[in-house]
Amino acid sequence: MAKYNEKELADTSKFLSFVLRHKPEAIGIVLDREGWADIDKLILCAQKAGKRLTRALLDTVVATSDKKRFSYSSDGRCIRAVQGHSTSQVAISFAEKTPPQFLYHGTASRFLDEIKKQGLIAGERHYVHLSADEATARKVGARYGSPVILTVKAQEMAKRGIPFWQAENGVWLTSTVAVEFLEWPFMPAGVQKQ
């Protein structure tokens, strides 16, 4: 595997997230309904748009991404973002899955008032993203400011017929989380959920 610096890997990951999740048309590629893009076309279009992209760089980003944001097709000819899409070109068909008792959502404290009014909504994305552990949710929340972890009563939601899915990288997905299924983060540190 070729050597790339952290900035180059992070910049490439952000670029891939942008074109494979949100705006494939920005460089002239088309994704299929499952989010797949032909790798040769992606590289060519990225280079035409002025972005340095090679197969070796793609391989490194896919292999080293701690969040496993991207995956290759079984034949190695296509790549996709595993989840997080806002483009209408993509509608990945995830298998429905029974969630654990609790899941977690990391957000910033500045968003709490809005969440208390409307719950968690997907916004521009297709799904609300949830984590199986608080540490991951805290990292997600920290991207937006002072992190706050909301506990989602996932099994209670599932018992009421609200579906959940899990992406290849372990991220849990659901369409929305009503306020009644949220536990607010005003518990002492270290308190365990039953």
Curated annotation (Swiss-Prot):
This is Probable RNA 2'-phosphotransferase. Gene3D superfamilies: 3.20.170.30, RNA 2'-phosphotransferase, Tpt1/KptA family, N-terminal domain. Its EC number is 2.7.1.-. The keyword NAD applies. InterPro entries: Ptrans_KptA/Tpt1 (IPR002745), RNA_2'-PTrans_C (IPR042081), RNA_2'-PTrans_KptA (IPR022928), RNA_2'-PTrans_N (IPR042080). GO terms for molecular function: NAD+ poly-ADP-ribosyltransferase activity; tRNA 2'-phosphotransferase activity. SUPFAM superfamilies: ADP-ribosylation. Keywords: NAD, Transferase. Removes the 2'-phosphate from RNA via an intermediate in which the phosphate is ADP-ribosylated by NAD followed by a presumed transesterification to release the RNA and generate ADP-ribose 1''-2''-cyclic phosphate (APPR>P). May function as an ADP-ribosylase. One of its GO terms (biological process) is tRNA splicing, via endonucleolytic cleavage and ligation. It comes from Escherichia coli O45:K1 (strain S88 / ExPEC). PANTHER family: PUTATIVE PHOSPHOTRANSFERASE (PTHR12684), TRNA 2'-PHOSPHOTRANSFERASE 1 (PTHR12684:SF2). It comes from the Bacteria. Belongs to the KptA/TPT1 family.
